[in-house]
Amino acid sequence: MPPAKKKPRAYDPAKIRAAVTAQFGHVARGVAELGPEQLARPSGLGAWTVAELAAHIAWIADSLAAGLARPPAAVPELTAVEWPFATASLAGKISEAARETLAGAPLPELYERAGAGMARALEAHTGARVLDLWIGDMTLADFLVTRTVELVVHTDDLNRAAGADIPLERQALAACTRLLADALALKAPGGSVEVRIPPFAVVQCIEGPRHTRGTPPNVVETDPLTWIRLATGRTDWAAALDEARVRASGERADLSALLPLMS
């Protein structure tokens, strides 16, 4: 008899909205403090400069407001946990949108406009609204969870590329970590390996003997930021093991063939 389908993780809509808003505010304040030399640095993401990466983050908020301004879609086609696997096909569109956004106004003005537009749009709509999106139609509630991934991942990118110290909102970091952990479990269903990302997530994955009691024989443990970098291709499995940022025990405790989940 096949195992019962796991119920998707539930997120508190109010906390997610607050986390997205707070993280965008952290980035806006951090970007305002970057100097010309920092903005001209390579971002580490293809050919983007730090300025283009910053413009992309402004676009994240701007595009959310634009999506809510469009007529709603009929039914959702994509859930939050499926979203990471659908992102690769949009890289070209997103890169072009970042360049167009940066050409539109200075960064401080972009952030002020995008933040205000996002706030107005979120105030006017409930999480049940279905957005008509490039990637596939999603409920606003699910799409906002994916915004925590975009914002946390790119805040980390900005910090590393520009030498900044923009804070990560705890609730945004938690939601990002959990969504990417659940995506791993969706990609490799099973119960032979336990992946621990304290204090936010524990999932089981990979086909094989399911552990039911005591200490699991196959365990992977890491911290949230290392997990996010692994899941998004910012670092690789071997390097994380060598640097002791990942602890893996058991013959099945190897996630290298499953990572990254998105890039």
Regions of interest found by a model, annotated:
Residues 2-15, 63-116:
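Short, helix-capping/interhelical loops that line the mouth of catalytic, cofactor-
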Residues 2-51:
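An N-terminal domain-cap segment
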Residues 189-226:
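Glycine/small-residue-rich hydrophobic helix-like segments
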Residues 16-23, 107-114, 144-147, 173, ...:
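Amphipathic alpha-helix face/heptad-repeat signature
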Residues 2-6, 70, 85, 89, ...:
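C-terminal interaction segments
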Residues 94-147:
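Internal, conserved structured core segments that host functional sites
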Residues 41-80, 130-179:
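Short, contiguous alpha-helical
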Residues 171-199:
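A glycine-rich beta-turn/hairpin centered on an aromatic-Pro dipeptide
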